[in-house]
């Protein structure tokens, strides 16, 4: 099932669970929301910033950009206190404001794109991620779902149609 593939993204939590019998809870590990340096923060306009300034040089730049009080930059506060402070700062400005600021700052931080923004992003367009089509009817063809499969296993760029409802029943319902 699709769920089986999700475990790949939980490598950190699975490693800790299997090796030390320490099973993760929500936001309790460094790479799962337990650190202010690797987290997701909500903006004033209810969008989100993906923040990953793990290395000190990126963290220091991030703190400078958001104007985080010096007492929160070091180890004088707990991670939870720093997360709460960063959350309160990020919520004061819109995603548009933060997007402009973080495009200029090298600190591993970006506004989380909407699905519409993501499919229109140059990164995906230049790689033809949505170029394959599925024929819906004589007039309509829609982009097929991209699959994480090596290009060598994909068919050429031909528009294919999907089976009509019930068309494959005899084949698969024996």
Residue ranges with predicted function:
Residues 134-174:
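Flexible, small-/acidic-enriched active-site or ligand-binding loops
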Residues 16-27, 121-136:
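Short, surface-exposed loop/helix-turn segments at secondary-structure junctions
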Residues 6, 78, 117-121:
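Beta-rich nucleic-acid/ligand-interaction surfaces
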Residues 103-127:
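Conserved PLP cofactor-binding pocket of PLP-dependent enzymes
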Residues 1-53:
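Active-site-adjacent "lid/gating" segments in soluble enzymes
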Residues 32, 36-109:
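Aromatic-enriched alpha-helical interface/lid elements that frame and gate functional surfaces
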Residues 38-40, 131, 148:
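Short, acidic/polar N-cap/turn motifs at the starts of alpha helices
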